[in-house]
UniProtKB/Swiss-Prot annotation:
PPIases accelerate the folding of proteins. It catalyzes the cis-trans isomerization of proline imidic peptide bonds in oligopeptides. It comes from the Bacteria. Pfam families: Pro_isomerase (PF00160). It catalyses: [protein]-peptidylproline (omega=180) = [protein]-peptidylproline (omega=0). Belongs to the cyclophilin-type PPIase family. One of its GO terms (cellular component) is cytoplasm. CDD domains: cyclophilin_ABH_like (cd01926). Keywords: Isomerase, Rotamase. This is Peptidyl-prolyl cis-trans isomerase slr1251. PROSITE patterns: CSA_PPIASE_1, CSA_PPIASE_2. Its EC number is 5.2.1.8.
Amino acid sequence: MMSKVFFDITIGSDTAGRIVMELFDEVTPKTAENFRALCTGEKGVGKAGKPLHFKGSHFHRVITDFMAQGGDFTRGNGTGGESIYGEKFADENFQLKHDRPGLLSMANAGPNTNGSQFFLTFVPCPWLDGKHVVFGEVVEGLEILEQLEANGSQSGQTKQAIVISDCGEIK
C-alpha cells in the first residue's frame, strides 16, 4: 500500500483546491516517510524551533514549463527547511526517473542534501535524473498543478502567494 497525502492550496486569497499525492514507499521508504510526516506534522518541532510541518508554507519558486518548488517552512525563501531526521539526509536512490508531469521529487543543494524542500514537475525533466530523488506522484488535482504553473514565471517569482493552507495523510 502506498501512502497517500494531500495539500489544500490557496493562491492569493482564493482556494485553488486539493492535490493528492501517492508516495513510492517501497522504492524510497526513507524519503517518502520524511514527506508523509511533514504533511501530518506529527514529529513536532524541529532543531530550527519551527514545527516540522508543511502547513502554512509557500511554494516559493514556480517556473513555467518546469516545476513548482516548496517545503521551506523555516525561512520561506528556498534557503531553509529541515527533515524529520535532522537538517539533511542522504539521497536514497535514483531508481525513478523524471519522465512525466506531476512527479514529486526532492529539491537539494547538491549530493546528499535533502531536507524538506521538494518540487512537483510540470513536464518531463530528464536532466534531473541521477541528481534528485523522485518519491511520489500527483494522483488527483493535476488541474491545481496547472493553476500553480499559471502563477509562475521564467524567473521562478510567483504572481501571487501560493500557500499550502492545509495538508495531511489520507488513510
